Amino acid sequence: MSPLKKTYVLKLYVAGNTPNSVRALKTLKEILEQEFQGVYALKVIDVLKNPQLAEEDKILATPTLSKILPPPVRKIIGDLSDREKVLIGLDLLYEELNEDEYNL
């Protein structure tokens, strides 16, 4: 019997359709599809169109990636191009390594 997969809930805060925003979204989608196929929900929030959401979530810079679930909440601000840094920053690589240890 295989264990249930966790669902990851993420928010990506961007400022408009700038090259940085487009690159961050493209890179993040590639990482998520490779690592978490079908077990994630990603909401993209444009802080220029929805400044109240950025204020509520205390977003000070873009792009910012926030992992909401599973707890604890983690945020990465800035460049998302390094896959390993993104996974470590969100506490996802550690979980992945831990699960591999038990599946030997």
Curated annotation (Swiss-Prot):
Alphabetical keyword list: Biological rhythms
Domain text: Has 2 forms, fold switches to a thioredoxin-like fold (KaiB(fs)) when bound to KaiC.
Pfam entry (one): KaiB
Entry's family note: Belongs to the KaiB family.
GO BP of this protein: circadian rhythm
Name assigned to this protein: Circadian clock oscillator protein KaiB
Stored InterPro entries: Circ_KaiB, KaiB-like, KaiB_domain, Thioredoxin-like_sf
HAMAP family to which the protein is assigned, alphabetical: KaiB
Function according to Swiss-Prot or TrEMBL: Key component of the KaiABC oscillator complex, which constitutes the main circadian regulator in cyanobacteria. Complex composition changes during the circadian cycle to control KaiC phosphorylation. KaiA stimulates KaiC autophosphorylation, while KaiB sequesters KaiA, leading to KaiC autodephosphorylation. Phospho-Ser-431 KaiC accumulation triggers binding of KaiB to form the KaiB(6):KaiC(6) complex, leading to changes in output regulators CikA and SasA. KaiB switches to a thioredoxin-like fold (KaiB(fs)) when bound to KaiC.
Superkingdom as given in the UniProt entry: Bacteria
Known partners and oligomeric status: The KaiABC complex composition changes during the circadian cycle to control KaiC phosphorylation. Complexes KaiC(6), KaiA(2-4):KaiC(6), KaiB(6):KaiC(6) and KaiC(6):KaiB(6):KaiA(12) are among the most important forms, many form cooperatively. Undergoes a major conformational rearrangment; in the free state forms homotetramers as a dimer of dimers. When bound to the CI domain of KaiC switches to a monomeric thioredoxin-fold (KaiB(fs)). KaiB(fs) binds CikA, leading it to dephosphorylate phospho-RpaA.
